[in-house]
Each structure stands twice: as structure tokens, then as C-alpha cells.
Amino acid sequence: MDRWGRTHEALRHAGWTLFAERGYDATSTAEIAERAGVSEMTLFRHFPTKERVLLADQFDPSMAAAVRARPADEHAMRAVAEGIRQSWSQMSAEDVESTRDRLRIIAEARTLRGGIERNNEETVAALERALVARGAGHPQARVAATAVVAGLSTALLDWARSDETTLHAALQSALDTLGGV
């Protein structure tokens, strides 16, 4: 990993650790930068806002690639649901726990409500482009991607708040519903 990547990961790790310890709203960007051993200006070169430290979604590229690889004649909603199912099924146990921890922080932070929607727009755009690449029209692609991301976000936040189910079970249920199974 190059210097940029190491710094980026150090900032993300410092942020996630502090958010878990103190809560998102009680953690400042200066504290994140200090914990990572860099200046606050460096933090903002990597993450334009504090919310991006927590909300930047590392799964968008793999989900979009999985959607693009779905059969061209498959309905857009089903293609998105199945592409996401395939992408998320490859998560390691460590990624699952990290995702639950991160989503719990997000679910508990009142000030992130608008940030979640802004972050989801990036995911919707990536999935929309994937659907268009497989031949869907723009309006159909946008509607399908938006519907699946909204439903999946709800399911994931519910899963993060509870210890009663596994990620696999929560995803299966949500994606079955969204994909019309």
C-alpha cells in the first residue's frame, strides 16, 4: 500500500475507533487527525467531511460489477438484488463485524440522517450505471437502483441495531423481497 493508502486507512481506522468509543456526534475531526498522527488538513484531503470517514462505502465497486455481470434479459430489480447478494456473500467474517459496528454507529448518530441519503446517492449512481451498461433505460435503472438501495439500507440498519439475526439472513430476506422472490 502506498503512502496515500496507508494514511487513508489510518484516518478511517482512527475515526471508526473514536466513533465507537465516544459516538459520532462527540468526536471531532481534530481528534481523528490527532489519533491518526496527521494534521486536520490532511484528514480533509482524504475525506471532505467528517461523515465521509464513516459513510464512504467500499462495497460500491464490487456491487456494481456484480450487477453488470447479471444476464442482460434479467429484470432490473432482480439484477440489482442478485448482484448485491452475490457481492455481499463474499464478505469475510471480519468485514461482517466491521460493517455491523459501523452501521450501529450510523444508526445511533442523529446528525447523520441526511448523510446516509447523500451517501446512498453514490451507491444508486454506481448501480444505475451498471444497469445502463447491461441495457436498461435510464429511468428504469434509476428507479430500480433507488428502490433496492432504500430497502437494503433499512434492512441493514435494522440488522445493525439487533443481535437477533445474521447479516446473511437479513440480506436474504431483504433481497428476496426487493428482487420479487
Predicted region positions:
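Amphipathic alpha-helical segments enriched in hydrophobic/aromatic and basic residues
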Residues: 19, 28-29, 50-56, 77-80, ...
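Amphipathic C-terminal alpha-helical segment
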Residues: 145-164, 180-181
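Amphipathic alpha-helical packing segments from all-alpha helical-bundle domains
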Residues: 109-134, 142-146
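N-terminal intrinsically disordered/low-complexity leader segments
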Residues: 1-4, 103, 175-176
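Hydrophobic alpha-helical connector segments
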Residues: 64-101
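Basic, helix-initiating cap at the start of DNA-binding domains
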Residues: 1-22, 26-41, 55, 62
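C-terminal peripheral helix-coil segments that are non-catalytic and often amphipathic
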Residues: 129-132, 164-181
